[in-house]
Amino acid sequence: MDDAGSSGGSGGFRPGVDSLDEPPNSRIFLVISKYTSESVLREHFSPFGDIQDIWVVRDKHTKESKGIAFVKFARSSQACRAMEEMHGQCLGPNDTKPIKVFIAQSRSSGSHRDVEDEELTRIFVMIPKSYTEEDLREKFKVYGDIEYCSVIKNKVTGESKGLGYVRYLKPSQAAQAIENCDRSFRALLAEPKNKVLESPEQDYYSSVRQETLGHEPRGNLFPFVGEQQSEFSTFDKNDSRGQEAISKRLSVASRVPFTEEQLFSIFDIVPGLEYCEVHRDPYLNYGHGVVQYFNVASAVYAQYKLHGFQYPPGNRIAVSFLDDGSNSADLIRKMATQMVAAQLASTVWSNPSHQQFLQFGGSAGSQVPQIQTDVVLPSCRKKAPPETPVKERLFIVFNPHPLPLDVLEDIFCRFGNLIEVYLVSGKNVGYVKYADRMSANDAITTLHGKILNGVRLKVMLADSPREVSKKRQRTY
């Protein structure tokens, strides 16, 4: 680009260096004849939209054209349509060599290859949880031919996460959808699947920071941050957020782009991370993402601790709540219950006398334990007599701490034929004895990997003591 010269007319708007990629994907790269002039390019490409400038790359010394040019449009959809219709065309009777047209790579991307069509056809949208794939298709089919739609769902419950993808057949159709759809969808260009950075991370960040750190984002185009915080004006931990509705879902915004792996590594510091997504906004060269936790307590803690966190050093990220349609009062009640349950479990576990108190009597024993979970549990069933032969033994691992014994008995008795639940003193593990193998298998299927009262359980078959005792003893 250093030796790109332009003889652009004085009547057109010439964007500055900082505006070359605003909006992103609005600049096309041309491979043309060395004899093709700017006026010919303007004649053939102006029907596609508002041309802001044309650059014909020339030799520094001879000033001859190198057969390469750039055309900057005002909108991404204009550039995409020009690429689709002009690639492989000839520009005149005296210019019989077909030209090549590509969407130019962003100057801040750190990559020297041109953008592929596949990267420009898939958009990411936020939708009501009631939306089906047909509803999504119906809303977005007006912008072009749709290859497929998908609604992201919870793998366990099958419930929509309020997120979806729409894939078009042409890049211009995806760009039209992003530019013209209702802003409530917060449509963004989705990250390519299995995208791999082509340059070392350090080089990538250094090049991006030179391009973006000195520029303030335009607040009205920053969809992931609340209107009060759109310009990263403050990162005070004591900001008043009384009007901000809490949820399990967070939006993350950064002046520096980030990958999904980097986003995960930051927010996985707080236990309970469910998933994270990275999105690309074609109008901004900034990092945008969505993070969701299994419980609201983790989300609240992550928002407080990570809002204003510097990653990479010198770049502060903005973290705010995203409305996921949940009832805030109900979420606060669940969070309070989880916190009390965790505090109670910690107190009981650190004091054996309290553990015995809860197990064998006391005022707490007369109350039915309250269980907070998304897991659908069967109703309570009677325990088997203590002298019943053990048919199956389960091993449980708790993270971050064990649940109280009364809660565990309430959970595991629901599968029937429960004999006993006991915890290993000083460890985050325990055992469950069943009088029937089917009941034990049902418990594993229902509870393994699930979160109850803020604690994740690993439930698996334990090694049988009888099998261990039958092993031949070593004689050496």
From Swiss-Prot:
PROSITE patterns: RRM (PS50102). Residues 26-106, 121-192, 392-464 form the RRM domain. There is a cross-link at K34 (Glycyl lysine isopeptide (Lys-Gly) (interchain with G-Cter in SUMO2)). InterPro entries: Nucleotide-bd_a/b_plait_sf (IPR012677), RBD_domain_sf (IPR035979), RBM45_RRM1 (IPR034203), RBM45_RRM2 (IPR034206), RBM45_RRM3 (IPR034207), RBM45_RRM4 (IPR034208), RRM_dom (IPR000504), SLIRP/GR-RBP-like (IPR052462). Expressed predominantly in fetal brain, in neurons but not glial cells. Mostly expressed in neuronal progenitor cells with reduced expression in differentiated cells. Less abundant in adult brain where expression is limited to cerebellum, olfactory bulb and hippocampus. Also found at lower levels in fetal and adult kidney, heart, lung and spleen. Residues 1-20 are annotated as: Disordered. PANTHER family: HETEROGENEOUS NUCLEAR RIBONUCLEOPROTEIN 87F-RELATED. This is RNA-binding protein 45. The gene is Rbm45.
